[in-house]
Curated annotation (Swiss-Prot):
Coiled coil: none
Gene behind the chain: Capn13
Enzyme Commission code: 3.4.22.-
Pfam annotation, one family: Peptidase_C2
Domain of life: Eukaryota
GO biological process, one term: proteolysis
Keywords, comma-separated and alphabetical: Hydrolase, Protease, Repeat, Thiol protease
Domain EF-hand: 534-569, 632-665
Ranges of residues in domain Calpain catalytic: 30-329
Function: Probable non-lysosomal thiol-protease.
Family in the record: Belongs to the peptidase C2 family.
Molecular function via GO: calcium ion binding; calcium-dependent cysteine-type endopeptidase activity
UniProt-annotated catalytic positions: C91, H247, N271
Entry protein name: Calpain-13
Amino acid sequence: MAHDAETSVVKFKNQDFRTLRDHCLSRGQLFIDDTFPAAASSIGEKLLRGKHLSKLEWKRPTSKDLPFYPPHFILEGASRFDIHQGIAGDCWFLAALGSLTQNPQCLQKILMDQSYSHQYAGIFQFRFWQCGQWVEVVIDDQLPVIGDNFLFVHPRGGNKEFWPCLMEKAYAKLLGSYSQLHYGYLPDALVDLTGGVVTIINLHSSPFDLLTTVKTAIQAGSMVACATENGLTEEAKVMENGLVSQHAYTVTGAEKIQYQGRWEDIIRLWNPWGKTEWKGRWKDGSKEWRETHDPRKSQLYENKEDGEFWMSCQDFQENFSCLFICNQIPITMDHGVTPNESWRQMRFTNQVISRNRAGGHGRDMQYVFSVQEHTAGNNVVVAFTIMPQSLNTEEERFPLQFQVFKVPQFQNVQGRLPPAFFSPFRSAAQGTKYVSKCNFTKSFHLNPGTYVVVTTANGKEVEFLLRIFLKMPDKHRDPSSNFNLRALKESLPENGSRNSISYTYMDQGLDIDATQLQSLLNQEFLTGPPGDTFSLDQCQSIMALMDLKVNGRLDQEEFARLRSRLIHCQHIFQSIQRRPGVLLSSDLWKVIENTDFLVGIFISSELLSLMALRYSDSSGRVSFPTLVCFLIRLETMAKAFRNLSKDGKGIYLTETEWMNLVMYS
């Protein structure tokens, strides 16, 4: 049955970390894991072909004859640069892991609190998510080496950090052997590390704003990764442009950068190999980096052979096939990434379906859900996750298939729907799907009504988890959990700092469009965790109100005028807010009263009440970006009336004049 209970933790192979560690400590022994022995069987034949098996040894990082002695579990924080891929083709797992390092809080949940310096007994534990529950995997720290070289993931340079090596071993144990890591699906690793749901974007066919998508997704704590297409062979090969075919990369950032008097979108990637980088535009040491005068250059760029590099977003979309975004809720792409959307989840765990030998829907399983109200874009995501034990390594197709049908409005669903319901004339709902080895996800836009998910098995008995995500209308959003007001930075002085980002752009006389304005405002005026930032829609609105030339851009003079108002709004917000980041709609009259650029503007109590409804959330709170939009619009509309009125009492406009005024503002 469906439930929303707290996810449980299961001991893999019934091994309890504390019991085993304490037993070893009491006897002065180092743990030896008989369930995943230091033997060729734990590696697998596929990865041992052609290797010098006579020289293969298993050593602990504490061995003094290794160049990494003394070892550390983590030293000065976990980073993607601690990872260096070995002979296994597990870039799909390491790219996901590299992305997870950008969210230290989530990473700590699976790394646990352990070290080589405190209560060391040769035993370590890690957590992975499988079919609705966290699985705790215990390993010993014996790692396969040939000479001084680790066969699989090994520490980079001289940092002596072994958390990536040990975590890779734990994941290999969970899947059965190191060979099971050799080629896999990036979405499966993202789900196994987080328990989230993956949104897959086809870079060749999806019209979307790549820069905004990546920046917003990362700010929302999402894991973001990508993959190149297959080459001419089954093996991953380095291409002439420096990219690797059939290879996974971590997406670590995206920026809009100034170059030759214009703006260019660039994206930053990391290669789990720890080397081998892009050789095209914006590569390390490129003329683009030498010639750019962007003030953030020193913050963004460092010429190092560490596997991380920048490339233009245009080159990225031409050379990569898919972008993968993993979050605890679906990320819909209909109107850009909106991480504050509210979703409800129905979860069906430990589901078992037997093989359907008779065909049709006679042995199917059915799950009913309802869509209550109209919402924009994709509003239902159906996600199946298969238990690894149910997978057949020889079978390429997914072991389940499913469809979603709408139940007629007046048909009462009690128990199973009969086979007659699924006539050849009843069409299934159409959605966007993605299938990997362990996960099958479909996204739908469904009208209000009752629906049934019908699934059948393709082969043997299958155990699975089903999650149905339902988007809630904005009014159902829980403000305490889904709405984080972002804190304002300390007030900027009226004359500004010559080192501020916006002043640098003003000095260079560059025009700014709405996307650039969004980036500047969020960097200069807001700080703290992701939450209510200046959205692109708000910046387009501000742009229209301040754009005197009506060309869709702000010149130096227009931006300077906007900046002075923003600083004044900042002072007002901070002086009237009830607590950091929270201004109540009931205090809007105080705001208007204290806003210098609104002097002489009259606003009735009736209009003030309407504005409180228009610009506050369901809890009566007004964010700083929303307040800015309100105050600038109020000033602009009042000035427009005065300019158009001949007697100060009223105005006469043609339909065209009226439409021009209200539609571009």
